[in-house]
A protein has these predicted regions:
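Sec-dependent N-terminal signal peptides
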Residues: 4-13
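Immunoglobulin-like IPT/TIG beta-sandwich domains and homologous Ig-like subdomains
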Residues: 418-480
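Active-site clefts of carbohydrate-active enzymes
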Residues: 268-290, 810-830
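Active-site-proximal helices and loops of the catalytic beta/alpha 8
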Residues: 108, 175, 186, 191-275, ...
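Structural recognition of the beta-strand scaffold that forms the well-ordered cores
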Residues: 33-35, 64-69, 119-120, 189, ...
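Beta-strand/beta-sandwich contexts
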Residues: 401-433, 486, 490-495, 499
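Substrate-binding/active-site clefts of carbohydrate-active enzymes
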Residues: 20-48, 52-63, 69-183, 203-217, ...
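Carbohydrate-interacting/catalytic domains
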Residues: 16-66, 72, 105, 110-111, ...
């Protein structure tokens, strides 16, 4: 199985980049079908649980989901506890075991949204003995014996056979199938189809297709020639299946295989479903490992590459399912993950989708080979694939083509209607010496190619005309007599994508470190293609949190008042240790498999949007990980900053705008490495800069993102980064980007915000910056409760806010009480609940965009402060409600920030604060129709609110406490020690 880990590059190249369903009928020629056993697919065994797995199937490469029978199961003659799926009691309902019709509709809608089709398992031959038709319809609707009892077939004691000699049966069956077509299904897999007359299938299939208004797919569980004549698109390859079992067991060989292959060649478009397992084989004959042993991969290759074949994956095969599913009972669900079996099937799907030569209708040429091997070539549309399979141990196999030299093409796909120019990075052995062009691609053409320092790269400029249509184009490469092509997909851009809105001062941003949040899928904690394994007890190890965990908490976050999520990087970080944080990226276009997949991330964004939560991606342009794939073969010598030995950045931001700076100091600031495991990228290289521009746009379009947070912003080359920001905003004018500028020097921080009148003329084009000075002021001010001198206590907050004169856009500052790099606010404030609530009160009401670190709302503290980052980045305490102090903090936070959602004065109102040197802070936020008053008492004693001091505000109004909703007279108001009050006019 080790060889499967070597397939990752091929998968990355060939994997589908579908952004939306295609409207044209693909003819099913390259479709991958997945048989979904709802009962056993998930621990819950429901449509809802299965729906959650659809993004994984899409990422796997599945095109068509075949749902095993989902109808109510008869009770009369029932086998086992739950019964056989194929003993149907009602054709127009769902089995309550699986869920409701509405649950099924949701499943179909989600599959269609992902670009997959759904077909139903249809059992037209028989019903259960207690189907209503048995007693409510004429007796002749069923075959009956001389005593009037319904007839069974084989050992199927739980069924009653229908009589298609009755017109009523035909009409009722057609009407039942219409019911499901109207609900959006895309076709039917017809059980035991040959037992139902041809003269039923022929008009029924034709009628359903005519009425559907879209292509419908019909698959027959049969192998009679008349199936195609009746209108079926494909039929089972039962004979072939039993043959490959025999070959694997040594009782048959090449001669029998060639004879069977000839029937595939002669099929002339009549497709055959090929499989190594299905529900019958798994439960009754055994798993593919039982039947085929070590030959299972080789036999799979035949299923996926022969002419006129359609490949099937049965539930659990992609997880290495090693047991026979119980047929009449609930069984253990497969252990989903990203192991070598998933990699194998992902590779097969990628080959099938990436090569027209592997379409069902592609040409076939058998080659000479030894007695224990079959070799053949498949050809279509200029594409050519060589397949070789050994028919005896050691069962070697290969799928090869000239295109195998291509390891990567990035971006992996693109969109119509974009402003950002497209330049493809093509990585492959010696590809720099090849020519590139698009053939027969109206509106899409190559305008230039550029060699790199390494011969294994080619940069290809692509022009996409305004009228270019979405679709899969072929990028052709040629060198002398040699040529090959690869697919490149151009997607239709979402309507309104360019006008997307972003995060603002009206939002509450919730910072999640995914590995330390919630583990929603323990099966992906480790992966065959990543190095570091999970170690939940290690401070700096991987704990297992993932995308599924974030998704599971969206309802909690919405209820909390969260309107935006910033998660620390989810992209692949395959360094040897401390990879949990994600800041040492090793692949810019793929989500780390221990978090999930690209499709799961996109689904998370969709789900978040349904909860009215925006999604902000944390991106790193300054450095990559030392195990990034390009580190073994850099495109250009100056792709990264190379030093004679490890040279750390001097971390001195002032070198970027110091009028007296020495050049060596400025260069070291920009070019020194951030860490020994994080090589510093050189954005002065124009190809790298263009790479990062496209990469950012790609993720915005692909995942439908709402914003970026840029890590270590001033460490980048500042002029290229200014250009990078400008290019993103040219594509998305209302998009927001916040940069990390970690300094307590207000003018130094202000220098990096777009529009700031810098004396050197520099404009970063960076819309938002993180307000580290204010965060420091929060911690220093609220942790001091002693006698107040000139610069102690809450005057620090006053002074910091007074420095807003330096900021070009004070409302577009990200303000926070802490983040993943700093001590938690409860730690900073001595675990004092009143002080933490005061911090949240200031966070909710001061200017800017509030951000809170995950779990701070439940009064989380570091596990071990001596462990630094590893100690503060605790796992989210899912049982927080059992802790009264955590629940009290949560309830306060929830009330505060849900109130903030609807408060225009806090979002955009004028700010007026009042200077006092008694360790209190008073502030008004003033909008046209409302005012908000905030008073924070940081003393260890009660304080009277000096309401008369605020007369200039015009305080004659009725005021209400925003937490309790009660009316308050602020002229006679005292605020308890280490507490606050927030009032609002109505």
């Amino acid at each position: 199985m080790k060889r499967l880990t070597l397939l990752a590059a091929a998968i990355a190249l060939l994997a589908s980049c579908t952004g939306s369903p295609k409207t044209e009928d693909a003819g099913w020629n390259n479709s991958v079908i997945y048989e979904l056993n709802t009962r056993q697919f998930t621990p819950e065994g429901t449509f809802k649980a299965a729906e959650d797995q659809l993004p994984r199937l899409k990422e796997q490469g599945v095109d068509v989901v075949w749902m095993m029978p989902l109808y109510p199961i008869g009770e009369k003659g029932r086998k086992g506890t739950l019964g056989s799926y194929y003993a149907i009691k009602d054709y127009c309902a769902t089995n309550p075991e699986f869920g409701t019709l509405e649950d099924f509709d949701s499943f179909v809608a989600k599959a269609h949204q992902l670009g997959m089709k759904v077909i139903l398992d249809w059992v037209a031959n028989h019903t259960s003995p207690d189907h209503a038709w048995v007693t409510e319809k004429p007796a002749e609707w069923y075959y009956r014996d001389e005593n009037g009892n319904t007839v069974i077939e084989y050992d199927w004691t739980d069924i009653a056979k229908l009589n298609y000699g009755c017109e009523g049966v035909r009409e009722a069956m057609l009407e039942a199938m219409r019911f499901w077509v109207a609900r959006g299904v895309d076709g039917f897999r017809c059980d035991m189809a040959s037992l139902v007359p041809e003269d039923f299938w022929t008009p029924t299939i034709a009628t359903l297709r005519e009425e559907a208004g879209k292509p419908l797919f019909f698959l027959a569980e049969a192998e009679e020639d008349w199936m195609h004549r009746a209108g079926f698109d494909a039929m089972y390859a039962w004979r072939f299946h039993h043959l490959i079992n025999d070959i694997a067991q040594g009782s048959k060989g090449k001669a029998e295989l060639l004879e069977e292959v000839q029937t595939f060649v002669d099929a002339q478009g009549r497709k055959r479903l090929c499989f190594t397992s299905n529900h019958d084989e798994n439960s009754w004959a055994g798993t593919e490992f039982e039947r085929m042993g070590e030959a299972w991969q080789a036999m799979s290759i035949l299923c996926w590459t022969l002419p006129n074949s359609l490949p099937l994956i049965y539930t659990g095969q992609e997880a290495g399912l090693s047991w026979r599913f119980k047929f009449f009972e609930k069984d253990e669900a497969p252990h989903w993950g990203n192991g070598e079996y998933a990699e194998f099937y992902r590779y097969l799907c990628a080959q099938r989708h990436g090569h027209p030569a592997l379409d069902a209708d592609a040409g076939f040429e058998l080659l000479e080979s030894g007695d224990d091997e079959i070799r053949f070539i498949r050809r279509k549309a200029g594409d050519e694939v060589l397949v070789s399979v050994q028919l005896k141990a050691p069962w070697k196999w290969s799928i090869s083509s000239e295109a195998d030299r291509i390891e990567r093409v990035e971006p992996m796909c693109w969109w119509t209607g974009m402003k950002t120019p497209l330049q493809l990075l093509v990585k492959g052995e010696g590809i720099g010496e090849w020519n590139a062009c698009f053939k027969d691609a109206k509106g899409v053409r190559v305008t230039g190619t550029h060699k790199a320092d390494s011969p294994n790269y080619l940069f290809v400029d692509v022009e996409i005309a305004a009228g270019a249509q979405p679709g899969t184009y072929r990028l052709h490469f040629s060198k002398g007599e040699k040529s090959f092509s690869i697919p490149y997909e151009l997607l239709e851009r979402r309507e309104g994508s360019a006008e997307r809105k972003s995060f603002s001062s009206a939002d509450l941003m919730y910072l999640i470190m995914p590995d330390r949040f919630v583990n929603g899928n323990p099966y992906n904690d480790n992966s065959a293609v990543t190095t570091e394994k999970a170690d939940p007890k290690a401070f700096f190890g991987r704990h297992g949190g993932d995308i599924a965990g974030i998704s599971s908490q969206l309802g909690y976050l919405e209820d909390l008042g969260v309107t935006a999520i910033w998660n620390t990087p989810l992209l692949e970080d395959n360094v040897d240790k401390e990879s949990y944080h994600g800041y040492a990226c090793t692949d810019y276009y793929h989500i780390d498999s221990r978090f999930g997949s690209n499709e799961e991330y996109r689904e998370l964004v969709r789900d978040a949007h349904e909860h009215d939560i925006k999604m902000i991606m944390d991106i790193v342009t300054n450095h990559c990980g030392n195990r990034h794939w390009w580190m073994e073969d850099l495109p250009f010598k100056d792709w990264i900053h190379v030093w004679p030995e490890y040279t750390h950045s001097n971390c001195c931001f002032s070198a970027q705008n110091d009028p007296y700076v020495a050049e060596i100091d400025r260069y070291n600031m920009e070019s020194g490495w951030f860490d020994t495991s994080m090589p510093d990228m050189n954005l002065d290289n124009p190809y790298l800069l263009q790479y990062f521009k496209q990469w950012a746009v790609w993720w915005i379009e692909w995942a439908d993102l709402d914003g970026f947070r840029v890590d270590t912003y001033p460490y980048n080359e500042k002029y290229p980064m200014s250009e990078w920001c400008a290019s993103i905003l040219e594509e998305y004018p209302d998009f927001n980007i916040v940069g990390e500028v970690w300094s307590n020097n207000v003018p130094q921080v202000a220098y990096w915000q777009a529009g700031n009148p810098n004396r050197d003329g520099f404009n970063s084009n960076l819309p938002a910056i993180m307000d580290f000075p204010l965060q420091t002021a929060f911690c220093q001010a609220l942790s001091y409760h002693g006698k107040v001198n000139w610069d102690e206590g809450l005057v620090k907050v006053y002074d910091c806010v007074a420095n807003d004169q330096y900021y070009h856009d004070k409302d577009n500052m990200l303000i926070f009480t802490g983040n993943h790099d700093q001590e938690r606010i409860a730690d900073c404030l001595g675990k004092d609940a009143g002080s933490v609530k005061n911090a949240f009160a200031l966070l909710a009401t001061l200017r800017g965009i509030p951000q809170v670190l995950y779990a701070d709302e439940v009064f989380a503290v570091s596990k071990d402060r001596s462990q630094g980052h590893g100690g503060l980045r605790v796992d989210f305490p899912l049982e927080w409600e059992k802790d009264p102090q955590a629940k009290d903090m949560h309830d306060y936070f929830k009330a505060l920030f849900n109130w903030r959602k609807g408060c225009e004065a806090v979002h955009n109102g004028e700010l007026k604060h009042f200077l006092r040197r008694d360790n209190t802070y008073a502030m008004f936020r003033i909008a046209e129709k409302e005012k908000v008053f905030v008073f924070v008492n940081n003393n260890e004693a009660e304080v009277q609110v000096p309401w008369a001091d605020y007369s200039e505000i015009g305080t004659d109004a009725q005021w209400f406490d925003v937490i309790t909703g009660q009316a308050v007279d602020p002229a006679h108001l005292s605020v308890a020690a280490k507490s606050n009050i927030i009032l609002q006019t109505r």
